[in-house]
């Protein structure tokens, strides 16, 4: 496998820490050891997160090509767009963000706090759009790029989650290689890796990266899109493409993609009671905050699987904390009593 042939622009601090979740593990019976790899602490650029790791492989093209404006898209409380705005500010580039109405959640402050607030503070041109949720290529995003061109700019396209970009899976191939180095220091290997999946490239990169040592199907994606078949197909497609890019040496098949569909409801961006319980439990046991859109759902999945005995006794499970905590501010009414 050859990831090193791709240029990488450093936007992160370096290897993200792996934290043992001792109190949460004990609370859930102590038969399974839980750990978290803290991608939520990976950068000083506006709280970072998993997209910052991905952007390290996209940004060289933007800089070398003389692009002057990063153009991206997401929901109103998109972590992706906040991280793109941060990278643009860091590099002295312009930034246009399309923020679509992906979540059926009504709160007077929803479009004024959290991620979108930070993007505005960092100087991004934030454009609200009424279109609903979808993980594919969006007309509003293409229109934003046309607008930049008409003004004489040169837009660099960054799709939702970086996932439709040809290099969108590379960052989390690097994640897997980083985990292997840390496992050598820890003296053991993780039996399972749990990760939230929506647009697909995070899990796709992990599948390829862990396929190198036979653990592709030990990456357990927790769907948070509530459109799991579309997400599953996108993970597989991105993983197959990424495997070719890095010369994995074997094909990625449907068997390699594990996507648990039990925890994504009621729909994208809306937490269920299990999501909220998981957010509170993790916060009160470990002071590790998760959000109602993504990490609260993957945390719910991992907790539920431990409680149900779905991980064999003695398993070591690595939870990939992808970030997203700024979105908590947009759901303050739900947590008004804690």
UniProtKB/Swiss-Prot annotation:
Record keywords: Hydrolase, Pyridoxal phosphate
Any one GO molecular-function label of the UniProt entry: D-cysteine desulfhydrase activity
Record has ATP-binding as a keyword: no
InterPro entries, per the entry: ACCD_DCysDesulf, ACP_carboxylate_deaminase, ACP_carboxylate_deaminase_bac, TrpB-like_PALP, TrpB-like_PALP_sf
Pfam family, one: PALP
Xref: SUPFAM superfamilies: Tryptophan synthase beta subunit-like PLP-dependent enzymes
Enzyme Commission number, as recorded: 3.5.99.7
Residues the record lists as N6-(pyridoxal phosphate)lysine modifications: 51
Catalytic activity line of the entry: 1-aminocyclopropane-1-carboxylate + H2O = 2-oxobutanoate + NH4(+)
UniProt record, GO biological process: 1-aminocyclopropane-1-carboxylate metabolic process; amine catabolic process
Enzyme class: hydrolase
List of catalytic residues: 78 (nucleophile)
Cofactors (names): pyridoxal 5'-phosphate
Entry keyword annotation includes Hydrolase: yes
Annotated family: Belongs to the ACC deaminase/D-cysteine desulfhydrase family.
Assembly description: Homotrimer.
Protein role: Catalyzes a cyclopropane ring-opening reaction, the irreversible conversion of 1-aminocyclopropane-1-carboxylate (ACC) to ammonia and alpha-ketobutyrate. Allows growth on ACC as a nitrogen source.
Protein name (record): 1-aminocyclopropane-1-carboxylate deaminase
Species annotation: Ralstonia pickettii (strain 12J)
Lineage of source species: Bacteria, Pseudomonadati, Pseudomonadota, Betaproteobacteria, Burkholderiales
Record gene name: acdS
């Amino acid at each position: 496998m050859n990831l090193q042939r791709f240029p990488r622009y450093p936007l992160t601090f370096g290897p993200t820490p792996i934290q043992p979740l001792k109190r949460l593990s004990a609370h859930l019976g102590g038969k399974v050891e839980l750990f978290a790899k803290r991608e939520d602490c990976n950068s000083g650029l506006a709280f970072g997160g998993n997209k910052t790791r991905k952007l390290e492989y996209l940004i060289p093209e933007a800089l070398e090509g003389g692009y002057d404006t990063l153009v991206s898209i997401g929901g109103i409380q998109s972590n992706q767009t906040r991280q793109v705005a941060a990278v643009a500010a860091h590099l002295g580039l312009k930034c246009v963000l399309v923020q679509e109405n992906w979540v059926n959640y009504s709160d007077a402050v929803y479009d004024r706090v959290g991620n979108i607030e930070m993007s505005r503070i960092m100087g991004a041109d934030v454009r609200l759009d009424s279109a609903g949720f979808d993980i594919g290529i969006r007309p509003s995003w293409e229109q934003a790029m046309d607008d930049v061109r008409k003004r004489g700019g040169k837009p660099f396209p960054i799709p939702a989650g970086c996932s439709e970009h040809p290099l969108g899976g590379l960052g989390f191939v690097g994640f897997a290689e980083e985990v292997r180095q840390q496992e050598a220091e820890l003296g053991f290997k993780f039996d399972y890796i749990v990760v939230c999946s929506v647009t697909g490239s995070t899990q796709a990169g992990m599948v390829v990266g862990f396929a190198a040592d036979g653990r592709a199907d030990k990456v357990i994606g927790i769907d948070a899109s509530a459109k799991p078949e579309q997400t599953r197909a996108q993970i597989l497609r991105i993983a197959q493409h990424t495997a070719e890019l890095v010369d994995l040496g074997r094909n990625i098949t449907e068997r390699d993609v594990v996507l648990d569909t039990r925890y994504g409801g009621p729909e994208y961006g809306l937490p269920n009671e299990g999501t909220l319980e998981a957010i509170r439990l993790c916060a009160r046991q470990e002071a590790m905050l998760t959000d109602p859109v993504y990490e609260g759902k993957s945390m719910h999945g991992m907790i539920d699987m431990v409680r149900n005995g779905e991980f064999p006794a003695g398993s070591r499970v690595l939870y990939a904390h992808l970030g997203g905590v700024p979105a908590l501010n947009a759901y303050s009414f739900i947590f008004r009593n804690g």
